[in-house]
């Protein structure tokens, strides 16, 4: 597929994937309404991003499904892009905890390689954007921005990650520093750094 030239300088993506029998958020008690619950969240995230950002920033729902008509109509009426991207990368077994969360990386890969933006960002679907991304884009000129989940040493999961990293790369720990544990809830970077990241 040839790359599409983007008319705007940045894109804010809300990725959403659905695969039957794959694990997703632990807060979804009613699996039969999973798509509906997530689509409502996606609409709130996309609409708030659109409201607070200027016309130089595109907002997109990136998904592997055809959104139900009621949500598609809402998004399209607010000039929010709907980008279809198959879940063909970073796809682990459906039993894997948070298996669908890795779709964010897949969506980022597809949009990066199919659209030519200066800046790329993705966020979880359960967010409300409260201001413009212009300052984020400026910071992306020098940095990759990620969300620090603030796991302390009291968190067993973090202890296991540190143990594995220490075994793999002892020099990383030689000065007593502990690496920051980043979550996948937020990512933003310029094009060059996104290419390195992905």
Where does each model-flagged region fall?
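Conserved glycosyltransferase catalytic-site signature
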Residues: 39-43, 101-105, 184
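A generic fold-level signal
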Residues: 6, 100, 122, 179-182
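Short His-Asn-centered micro-motif
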Residues: 61-65, 103, 123-125, 147-148, ...
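GT-A fold catalytic core of metal-dependent nucleotide-sugar glycosyltransferases
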Residues: 104-156
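A short, glycine-/small-residue-rich helix N-cap motif at loop->alpha-helix starts
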Residues: 93-103
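N-terminal anchoring/stem segment of glycosyltransferases
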Residues: 2-92, 115-116
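Conserved catalytic core of nucleotide-sugar-dependent glycosyltransferases
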Residues: 133, 137-197
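Short, solvent-exposed loop/turn segments at secondary-structure junctions
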Residues: 19-23, 65-68, 88-90, 127-129, ...
């Amino acid at each position: 597929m040839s790359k599409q030239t983007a008319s705007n300088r940045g894109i804010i993506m809300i990725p959403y994937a659905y695969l039957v029998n794959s694990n997703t958020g632990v807060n979804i008690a009613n699996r039969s309404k999973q798509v509906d619950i997530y689509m409502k969240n996606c609409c709130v995230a996309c609409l708030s991003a659109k409201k607070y950002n200027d016309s130089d920033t595109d907002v997109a729902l990136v998904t592997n499904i055809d959104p139900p008509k009621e949500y598609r109509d809402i998004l399209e009426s607010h000039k929010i892009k709907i980008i279809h991207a198959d879940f063909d990368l970073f796809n682990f077994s459906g039993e894997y905890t948070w298996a669908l969360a890795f779709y964010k990386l897949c969506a980022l890969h597809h949009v990066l390689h199919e659209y030519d933006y200066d800046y790329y960002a993705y966020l979880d679907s359960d967010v409300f954007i409260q201001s413009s991304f212009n300052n984020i884009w400026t910071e992306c000129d020098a940095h990759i921005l990620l969300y620090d989940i603030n796991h302390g040493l009291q968190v067993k999961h973090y202890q296991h990650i540190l143990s594995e990293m220490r075994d793999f790369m002892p020099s990383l720990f030689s000065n007593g520093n502990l690496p920051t544990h980043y979550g996948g809830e937020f990512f933003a970077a310029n094009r060059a750094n996104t290419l390195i990241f992905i």
